[in-house]
Amino acid sequence: MNPNQKIITIGSVSLTIATICFLMQIAILVTTVTLHFKQYECSSPPNNQVMPCEPIIIERNITEIVYLTNTTIEKEICPKLVEYRNWSKPQCKITGFAPFSKDNSIRLSAGGDIWVTREPYVSCDPGKCYQFALGQGTTLNNKHSNDTIHDRTPYRTLLMNELGVPFHLGTKQVCIAWSSSSCHDGKAWLHVCVTGHDKNATASFIYDGRLVDSIGSWSKNILRTQESECVCINGTCTVVMTDGSASERADTKILFIEEGKIVHISPLSGSAQHVEECSCYPRYPGVRCVCRDNWKGSNRPIVDINVKDYSIVSSYVCSGLVGDTPRKNDRSSSSYCRNPNNEKGNHGVKGWAFDDGNDVWMGRTIGEELRSGYETFKVIGGWSTPNSKLQINRQVIVDSDNRSGYSGIFSVEGKSCINRCFYVELIRGREQETRVWWTSNSIVVFCGTSGTYGTGSWPDGADINLMPI
């Protein structure tokens, strides 16, 4: 090959390489632009059940890094299909309960702006748990906190924070409410918010941040609801509401709600005589609630809800170790599954229990007359055997020298089973602590565990002498 041929060959090869590089750069540019725009787009299937990929979404799915020569492109994978929750997994097998969360709201109020609250509860969406409470329209270190022992005022609102975050000044006020319930159906939050005059209150149904439906008082006597989470199965949410006397017969209804719209209302049926402040949990294919009888029984009523045909069955927890306060001592107390026990039934406190085969797990105040201390245990045969009293796996959550209050259940879906958790309201201030003029609370939260656990006590812990008056 002569020199001229060599020059021509080298030039041709160089031109070919330059052309290839030029085409590669064009391909890289096109790919970059395409991926840049596609990271904000999702192709929606016919049922339109895909969440849009928009820059405002905080919770991302996965991120892939694609390397092309020296260019790095970040490509976001669109979120998975959003589906209704069906809660069809079995209940987790547990040996007891382990500590999960504590917000220390009252202790923090001694030196910070924390809301005055009561009636707290916990509920979870598919990815995260939140704490709720009914605020009193004031912080604790504020003269408006005087006389906040009252339950129903137009200033009360439903507060919502991530679990473990106290209700600070930046807390979202979800709705106006002096009674409430909240639950997530797998797609969005439903909030049931009751407010208004005692004799003509309104319940608002807020779904996905929008008011969808409402219902007025049907007995003109303090319309009220659960003060803990409702339950949604396959898009149908159930909430138990009562209107009427707190110490005689009242009118309880179970509302069935789909995306915020009331689709059916069933009256309470069965042998339960008085039902308030139910603590409900999914028991596929239905919903099961353990409630407060404020009239005749210190044994707790059970309400079983059929989500498919809207039928209702009610009875009472069989355990002779009863769950309400006030109550008789354990030697004298009784329950025979069907009817109220007529033992110190007038008055009571919100509480919880759940079935475990023929047995029952339950929590209650340690005090038989006062809302002091808190304990949990399992009663063998307590769900099916009348007046069963064999107690095992007892745990002290709050020692008897410290105050407690309401308690309730919430459910958390794991990979293979559904766990049951509970919270305890730790009330401080009036009526018992008269040095101060306010009434508020903090919470402590435990969840079921299949492991081992130790002992302890987790009271509110605030020194009332260090608190604002």
Curated annotation (Swiss-Prot):
Protein topology in the membrane: Single-pass type II membrane protein
Entry binding sites for Ca(2+): D293, G297, D324
First-tier enzyme category under EC: hydrolase
An annotated GO BP: viral budding from plasma membrane
Disulfide bond annotation, renumbered to this chain: C92-C417, C124-C129, C183-C230, C232-C237, C278-C291, C280-C289, C318-C337, C421-C447
Region (Head of neuraminidase): 91-469
Pfam families: Neur
Glycosylation sites: N61, N70, N86, N146, N200, N234, N402
A GO CC term assigned to this protein in UniProt: host cell plasma membrane
Family annotation (HAMAP family): INFV_NRAM (MF_04071)
Protein name as annotated: Neuraminidase
Species annotation: Influenza A virus (strain A/Hong Kong/5/1983 H3N2)
Lineage: Viruses, Riboviria, Orthornavirae, Negarnaviricota, Polyploviricotina
Name of the encoding gene: NA
